[in-house]
Regions:
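A helix-coil-helix interface module used to build multimeric assemblies
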Residues: 1-172, 178, 182-188, 197, ...
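Glycine-rich cofactor/substrate-binding loops
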Residues: 1-13, 53-57, 256-421
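Conserved hydrophobic residue
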Residues: 31, 36, 239-240, 358
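Short, well-ordered beta-strand elements within core beta-sheets of diverse protein domains
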Residues: 143, 211-219, 347-355
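Generic, well-ordered alpha-helical scaffold segments in large soluble proteins
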Residues: 24, 67, 71, 114, ...
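Conserved helix-loop functional segments at active or binding sites
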Residues: 121-124, 158-161, 165, 195-199, ...
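Acidic, glycine-rich loop-and-beta core segments that form the ion-binding/anion-interacting portion
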Residues: 186, 190-279
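Short amphipathic alpha-helical segments with heptad-repeat character
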Residues: 51, 98-105, 109, 116, ...
């Protein structure tokens, strides 16, 4: 990713656009073919020289063209014919975004493979599901990971759509009318650069493309933050059902030698906020004055390289996190039983209803016994067995049958089968 956003690659991509435009103009007879051969043979640039000229004239694209012209000589007069600065800048930028997107898609595919493997590994590992942070009903740890896998598959498709949205080029002149350039030049350059022509433009391609792209990066970052946040919760000392890999020589605190902190997960959550934060300036870049102002440019020079680079990094970090995640099934089972069977209250309720009890009334019977467990530590199962209202409908054996997590997980295979697993 660093190579894609390297300044040398940026200018080289712009030079590739300029040379392709010269080739197209030569086919149209606007440039001598011999001149194009000279341009292709001699065209080069020195980054420091571009900066030197830019400091004097305060226009980076003209500085670039001047620096290239010093290498090419007289034939440089044919470079940039009929084009405006954004013709080359926008088209080259979208080539770089295409390259960055390929990296991000590959990252996502690696993450998906790791998630799939670990989901299958813990397919039948029972754990407690939590809603509002409170014990709810049993699930499996494999289902948790399968959820992340499913979301990652969607993110791969989102990323492909976003990359396609950005794979457009624009060489239509100062206000998008092709006043001084033939539309064929745009078609030729875009085909050569792996893009399609923007169907209508002003001086720039419209920034709704970029807003959709950056928003997609933010959605993907949200998935990664969700994975990392779950690990952070599960690694809390009083939970410790799973935790980040901790290397033998790793240290968790400068003051507390005992510490094993979820630093990678915290880093992922933090950097996800950074990626998501770029959605706002991307939205604000959409409205530009008339046929174009330059307010979007300074934002994009920071936003796009930074967002793609940050996402590339946290995708790699998340893949490593999941791949090496330490999982403790025994602690998961211990925590599942922590509430003394309160998590089976839905099964007791349904058993009562199936025997003819009115639902709201049965709910109150089960709830009053559950509250005794919550508030006074009394045995939930024994209290149910002693409850006269409950016993009118359920035998002690029928109540006992409710206290089993296995029937609550009988459809795990069916859910996995939806993914061919």
């Amino acid at each position: 990713m660093a190579k894609i956003w390297d300044e040398r690659n940026e200018w080289q991509t712009m030079l590739d656009v300029e040379i392709a435009a010269c080739e197209a103009n030569a086919e149209l007879g606007r440039i001598p073919k011999e001149a194009v051969e000279v341009i292709k043979a001699k065209a080069d640039f020195d980054v420091e020289r571009i900066h030197e000229i830019d400091r004097e004239i305060n226009h980076d694209i003209i500085a670039f063209l001047s620096a290239v012209g010093e290498y090419v000589g007289d034939e440089a007069k044919y470079i940039h014919m009929g084009m405006t600065s954004t013709d080359v800048k926008d088209t080259a930028l979208n080539v770089q975004i295409k390259q960055a997107s390929d990296v991000l898609i590959a990252d996502l595919e690696k993450l998906a493979e790791v998630l799939k493997r670990r989901a299958v590994e813990f397919k039948y590992t029972p754990t407690i599901g939590r809603t509002h942070g409170v014990h709810a009903e049993p699930t499996t740890f494999g289902l948790k990971i399968l959820l992340w896998y499913s979301e990652t598959l969607r993110n791969i498709e989102r990323m492909k759509r976003a990359a396609s949205e950005m794979a457009v080029g624009k060489l239509s002149g100062a206000v998008g009318t092709y006043a001084d350039i033939d539309p064929y030049v745009e078609e030729y350059v875009c085909k050569k650069m792996g893009l399609t022509p923007e169907i209508v433009a002003t001086q720039v391609g419209q920034r709704d493309h970029h807003a959709e792209y950056i928003t997609t990066l933010g959605v993907i970052a949200g998935t990664l933050a969700q994975i990392a946040l779950e690990v952070r919760h599960l690694q809390r000392t009083e939970v410790r059902e799973a935790e980040e890999y901790f290397s033998p020589k790793q240290k968790g605190s400068s003051a507390m030698p005992h510490k094993r902190n979820p630093v990678k997960s915290e880093r992922i959550c933090g950097m996800a906020r950074l990626v998501q934060g770029y959605a706002l300036p991307a939205f604000e870049n959409i409205p530009l004055w008339h046929e174009r102002d330059i307010s979007h440019s300074s934002v994009e020079r920071v936003m796009i390289p930074d967002a793609t680079t940050a996402l590339d990094y946290i995708l790699a970090q998340t893949t490593d996190l999941v791949d090496k995640l330490l999982v403790y099934p025994e602690k998961m089972l211990e925590d599942l039983n922590m509430t003394g069977g309160l998590i089976y209250s839905p099964r007791v309720l349904l058993a009562l209803v199936s025997k003819g009890a009115y639902r709201d009334t049965a709910y109150r019977w089960v709830q009053r016994n559950a509250m005794k467990r919550w508030l006074e530590g009394e045995d939930f199962y024994e209290n149910l067995c002693k409850d006269e209202d409950v016993r009118k409908y359920l035998s002690e054996e029928e109540i006992k049958e409710c206290f089993d997590y296995k029937p609550m997980l009988i459809h795990v295979d069916k859910i996995f089968a939806r993914f061919g697993l």
